[in-house]
Structures are given as C-alpha cells and as structure tokens.
Curated annotation (Swiss-Prot):
<dbReference type="GO" id="GO:0005737">
    <property type="term" value="C:cytoplasm"/>
</dbReference>
<dbReference type="GO" id="GO:0000049">
    <property type="term" value="F:tRNA binding"/>
</dbReference>
<comment type="function">
    <text>An aminoacyl-tRNA editing enzyme that deacylates mischarged D-aminoacyl-tRNAs. Also deacylates mischarged glycyl-tRNA(Ala), protecting cells against glycine mischarging by AlaRS. Acts via tRNA-based rather than protein-based catalysis; rejects L-amino acids rather than detecting D-amino acids in the active site. By recycling D-aminoacyl-tRNA to D-amino acids and free tRNA molecules, this enzyme counteracts the toxicity associated with the formation of D-aminoacyl-tRNA entities in vivo and helps enforce protein L-homochirality.</text>
</comment>
<comment type="subunit">
    <text>Homodimer.</text>
</comment>
<dbReference type="GO" id="GO:0051500">
    <property type="term" value="F:D-tyrosyl-tRNA(Tyr) deacylase activity"/>
</dbReference>
<dbReference type="GO" id="GO:0019478">
    <property type="term" value="P:D-amino acid catabolic process"/>
</dbReference>
<comment type="similarity">
    <text>Belongs to the DTD family.</text>
</comment>
<keyword id="KW-0963">Cytoplasm</keyword>
<keyword id="KW-0694">RNA-binding</keyword>
<dbReference type="GO" id="GO:0106026">
    <property type="term" value="F:Gly-tRNA(Ala) deacylase activity"/>
</dbReference>
<dbReference type="GO" id="GO:0043908">
    <property type="term" value="F:Ser(Gly)-tRNA(Ala) hydrolase activity"/>
</dbReference>
<dbReference type="InterPro" id="IPR003732">
    <property type="entry name" value="Daa-tRNA_deacyls_DTD"/>
</dbReference>
<feature type="short sequence motif" description="Gly-cisPro motif, important for rejection of L-amino acids">
    <location>
        <begin position="135"/>
        <end position="136"/>
    </location>
</feature>
<dbReference type="InterPro" id="IPR023509">
    <property type="entry name" value="DTD-like_sf"/>
</dbReference>
<keyword id="KW-0820">tRNA-binding</keyword>
<protein>
    <recommendedName>
        <fullName>D-aminoacyl-tRNA deacylase</fullName>
        <ecNumber>3.1.1.96</ecNumber>
    </recommendedName>
</protein>
<keyword id="KW-0378">Hydrolase</keyword>
Amino acid sequence: MRVLVQRVTSAQVTVDGEVVGRIEPNPQGLVALVGVTHGDDDATARALADKLWRLRILDGERSAADLGAPILVVSQFTLYADTAKGRRPSWSAAAPGPVAEPLVDAFAATLRELGATVATGRFGAHMHVELTNDGPVTLLLES
C-alpha cells in the first residue's frame, strides 16, 4: 500500500459536479491519496492509517491526532504505475477494484476509529481533487 500524504489548508473532491468529500481544516489538515497493491490486507491498511494519524507533519511538529486535523482520503491506483518501459504506464502492480476498495474503506474506517474526522472520494469514479498544499509538504508512506 502506498499513501501519498499532503498537508493542506483546504481540500475537496467533486464527482459529476457534486462535492462528495470536503475538509475545512483550522488551520491544517491532510489529504491521503491511497493506492493498493497485490498482497495488501486489512492489517496493512490499519497500520498505515495509524501511522498517518500519528505522523508529526503539522505545525509545531504535531500530528493530526494531536490537533484533531481532518483527513480527506482518496483512492488512487495510479500510485502503482510502472513507467520503466515505453511511454504507456502499466497498472499491473495495482490491485483490482474488488480487492482495493475494501482496503481503502478499511484505511478510512481505521482513521475514524482513531478519532479522525474523515471525508472521502468515490472509489472508481473520475474525480476532481482540489487542494491547497501547505508548505508544501508531501510525503510517501509505504508498507
């Protein structure tokens, strides 16, 4: 599993003109773009969610857990693109939807269980993600 994390001051996801997820942090929140690969499981999703929740990347070296910062979770299979050969990416390392969707859901559910305010995109949809990156701070978490 890969989670591309961005520290933000605002973020929202729109599908077909409808806002399906939005966070309005005060002052900061996180956007987590989540990619799932073969071999990932519920334990992987839970461990990375816990790491994200406690990761000290907000102002004052504090975490989302410390500040109650909201998190927008968006599935993104393209995090597993293989661009080593040719000009067309291969997606073979990305888990198929029926495998990936429950794990992205488990990731978001774990964050909620830990106390996070979580908004989400819509799995499998063509999404428009708008965010204001703060810093900028962008990190890649991997299992």
